[in-house]
């Protein structure tokens, strides 16, 4: 009887222990749109769950900075996905951000070069009792012509 109690207590201790965080492979962030209102990105990640139990993803938070110093903002996107135990799960999340300042685009368009960006984010897992935030970072460039099209109004008869 004592051994049975010890086995039950050990099982409860393991079941209540905090899960190990998954590893996040930052695959890519693809700019899907740039216009006068804001910017859209598809964020692709690969999350590997090292635990013996499934983990639930609640949301993804992304913070975008352009050209090293232009803070576009932060957005949180609900994303309910299950990370299967002991497996890698691909995640693809669409993120839309409005320009925090209307003057953000003009200096970028006038710079005469592609615009580097960095997305710093967190993948939030768990529920109300236990929660884990796993950070990730993605970077890339936005082609100058995409910035120009967004920054300048169309002029009839002029092609860019």
Identify the role of each PLM range.
Residues 15-32:
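Bacterial Sec signal peptide processing site at the extreme N-terminus
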Residues 37-44:
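Short, solvent-exposed loop/turn segments enriched in Ser/Thr/Gly
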Residues 47-51:
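Asparagine-centered strand-capping/turn motif at beta-strand->loop junctions
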Residues 1-14:
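Sec-dependent bacterial lipoprotein signal peptides
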Residues 67-103:
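Intrinsically disordered, low-complexity Pro/Gly/Ser/Thr-rich segments with frequent PxxP/GP/PP motifs
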Residues 99-149:
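Terminal connector regions
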Residues 52-70:
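Short acidic, flexible loop segments centered on an aromatic residue
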Residues 144-160:
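Acidic, serine/threonine- and proline-rich intrinsically disordered appendage/tail regions
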């Amino acid at each position: 009887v004592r051994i049975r109690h010890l086995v039950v207590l050990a099982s409860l201790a393991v079941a209540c222990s905090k899960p190990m965080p998954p590893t996040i492979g930052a695959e890519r962030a693809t700019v899907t749109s740039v216009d006068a209102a804001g910017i859209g990105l598809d964020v692709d990640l690969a999350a590997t769950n090292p635990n013996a139990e499934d983990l639930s993803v609640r949301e993804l938070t992304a913070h975008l900075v352009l050209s090293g110093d232009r803070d576009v903002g932060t957005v949180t996107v609900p994303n309910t996905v299950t990370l299967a135990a002991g497996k890698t799960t691909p995640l693809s999340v669409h993120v839309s951000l409005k320009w925090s300042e209307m003057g953000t685009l003009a200096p970028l368009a006038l710079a005469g070069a592609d615009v580097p960006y960095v997305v710093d984010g967190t993948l939030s897992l768990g529920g109300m009792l236990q929660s884990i935030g796993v950070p990730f970072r993605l970077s890339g460039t936005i082609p100058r012509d995409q910035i120009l099209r967004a920054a300048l109004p169309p002029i009839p008869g002029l092609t860019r």
